[in-house]
Amino acid sequence: MFEGRPRDSCLVSTLFTMPSHKETKWSFLVSGKRSFLNNDESDLHFKKMYKLTTDSSEGEDNGSSSDSGTLIPGMNRDDSLSCLIRCSRADYCSIASVNRSLRSLIRSGEIYRLRRLQGTLEHWVYFSCHLNEWEAFDPRSKRWMHLPSMPQNECFRYADKESLAVGTDLLVFGWEVSSYVIYRYSLLTNSWSTAKSMNMPRCLFGSASYGEIAVLAGGCDSSGRILDTAELYNYEDQTWLVLPGMNKRRKMCSGVFMDGKFYVIGGIGVGEENEPKVLTCGEEFDLKTRKWTEIPEMSPPRSNQGNGMSAAAMAPPLVAVVNDQLYAADHAGMAVRRYDKEKRVWNKVGNLPEQAGSMNGWGLAFRACGDRIIVIGGPKAPGEGFIELNSWVPSVTTPEWHLLGKKQSVNFVYNCAVMSC
């Protein structure tokens, strides 16, 4: 029934009329029209930006004429790319099956690099409620995805872990037999591999990502010594760079990026006679001057402070930044607080979702996800067996939480990260 039509044309027509989630914007391409490319200035910027990469990519395929650099039949490469970067990343797996050029564009990560340059990002939530198992959730399509299982290593399986998403990678940090190890999940290959180790391997650190880089600060080494060192991770070449040391040693701290600077907040430091000491200060790292500045009382207050609980029993500060505003979850008081950067004080703005149960803050995820805050957790009661994902778009009003998803699961979140690409 397809005689006389180019092979790729059949595939494209079939793909573009396939049922997909509600955010997909492929349908206009069947007729070749550019219905939503109305911003001429934006398109001109994109064409200038992509011109630098066109020459090297056009000659990479030497197969049939339909595969030799053509992305979408009937459209030039620049217009095809303008359309492709606006599509949901949930569709890229299907799109990659159309022809070799599309597959190369997606599997190489080039399409995600162009999306970053254009500021076209989607924010997916990755979390683990079972040891060595990870799931992803797309807030736009409300779709759940199960990742391949992590490498089976009993020591790593039961060790404390930290996680961080940067670029199209999810990094999971842990302990394996006699040394620290980092496993890397690649969105491009949908597989796990061992990542390059830090210059000073550690655990219990504070971290955050910003575009194509991430900063890790503090933590403790394999002998348990609390560190004041920090490192910068470059996603593009997967390298680690040692940064200047902080003013204070700290572990079990949290990290965020705000106003283009990295902040490490709270944690446990070293007091007199090397005794553990709860830190209420934070530190700001300016990537331009490469200097740390201490900020007093930056760690959010907790409702159960002063009740005799060991500092090590409490989770690191649950913090998130949306639109350069810092928010925190007070798990004991079930409250949400906003940080006033000028007055350097925390103000309560509302409450956490009802089902945001935790064990001294452990098992509850509080993350920035684009222009919203995501809370993942379940009821405190044992045996309930479900978790909820609730979201709130911060504003001047009291938080109004919206249920994004709910599923049967262990109601304890071990690790959580948001991948923006």
Curated annotation (Swiss-Prot):
Keyword field contains Repeat: yes
Q: Where is the F-box domain?
A: 70-117
Gene3D superfamilies in the cross-refs: Kelch-type beta propeller
* Keyword Cell inner membrane included in the entry's annotation: no
Could you tell me which residues the Kelch repeats occupy?
114-167, 169-212, 213-260, 261-312, 320-366
Question: One GO CC annotation, please?
Answer: nucleus
Q: Which UniProt keywords apply?
A: Kelch repeat, Repeat
Annotated region described as Disordered, given as residue ranges: 54-73
**Protein name per UniProt:** F-box/kelch-repeat protein At1g26930
Q: Which organism is it from?
A: Arabidopsis thaliana (Mouse-ear cress)
Upper classification of the source organism reads: Eukaryota, Viridiplantae, Streptophyta, Embryophyta, Tracheophyta
